Amino acid sequence: MATPHINAEMGDFADVVLMPGDPLRAKHIAETFLQDVRQVNNVRGMLGFTGTYKGRKISVMGHGMGIPSCSIYAKELITDFGVKKIIRVGSCGAVSMDVKLRDVVIGMGACTDSKVNRLRFKDNDFAAIADFDMVRNAADAAKAKGIDARVGNLFSADLFYSPDPTMFDVMEKYGILGVEMEAAGIYGVAAEFGVKALTICTVSDHIRTHEQTTAAERQTTFNDMIEIALESVLLGD
């Protein structure tokens, strides 16, 4: 049954959903990597699709920017459409000099300055972590493709334009591999409703060096990340 933000019916979504931030990126993933694709959502332009990858039913849908937005879509997919696994696929910024442009980062955990998980967890700190089997399957899928993926902590920020750049020094000291805006929220929703989640990011820019990937480079490295995510689903079956 349709929700306020998703105009689909039970069965329209697979039990596994890949979620980029950009709905147009979701469309690209569906058209490039899936077969027998059909659109299952268009509310507020947040496009969702379901198809098959090597015979396995998989869905892909955008989640927008930031923890509040992604939390809405993740919650509705889980509680109203029976989704059991969510894989966020997106970009991140690097703060450490040993993390390079175009690196693939598998988010084992996610720190955050958001209060959303504290609200969920009665004002206590919540350790926002990915599902171990999903982390392992993604790492194995990357290795099979010859990609040296990094595995570790992300930082999910509420602000894209941070007023306090000294926080990047703290992140580097604590070994944060990438800064993005959603992983901690998705992990929190997954924990609340007893399902599994993972975030895989590609480093699109380096906060220290101000390096940025070109549009063509982003497309190539993004495709590597999507293939890792899709192959990890097969490994998890």
UniProtKB/Swiss-Prot annotation:
Phosphate binds at residues 21, 25, 44, 88-91. Its EC number is 2.4.2.1. Coiled coil: none annotated. It is an enzyme of class 2 (transferase). GO terms for cellular component: cytosol. Keywords: Glycosyltransferase, Transferase. It comes from the Bacteria. It catalyses: a purine D-ribonucleoside + phosphate = a purine nucleobase + alpha-D-ribose 1-phosphate; a purine 2'-deoxy-D-ribonucleoside + phosphate = a purine nucleobase + 2-deoxy-alpha-D-ribose 1-phosphate. The keyword NADP does not apply. Gene3D superfamilies: Nucleoside phosphorylase domain (3.40.50.1580). GO terms for molecular function: purine-nucleoside phosphorylase activity. A purine D-ribonucleoside binds at residues 5, 180-182, 204-205. The active site is at residue 205. GO terms for biological process: purine nucleoside catabolic process. It holds the Pfam family PNP_UDP_1. The record marks 218 as: Important for catalytic activity. PANTHER family: PURINE NUCLEOSIDE PHOSPHORYLASE DEOD-TYPE, URIDINE PHOSPHORYLASE. Homohexamer; trimer of homodimers. Catalyzes the reversible phosphorolytic breakdown of the N-glycosidic bond in the beta-(deoxy)ribonucleoside molecules, with the formation of the corresponding free purine bases and pentose-1-phosphate. Belongs to the PNP/UDP phosphorylase family. This is Purine nucleoside phosphorylase DeoD-type. The lineage of its organism: Bacteria, Pseudomonadati, Pseudomonadota, Gammaproteobacteria, Enterobacterales. The gene is deoD.
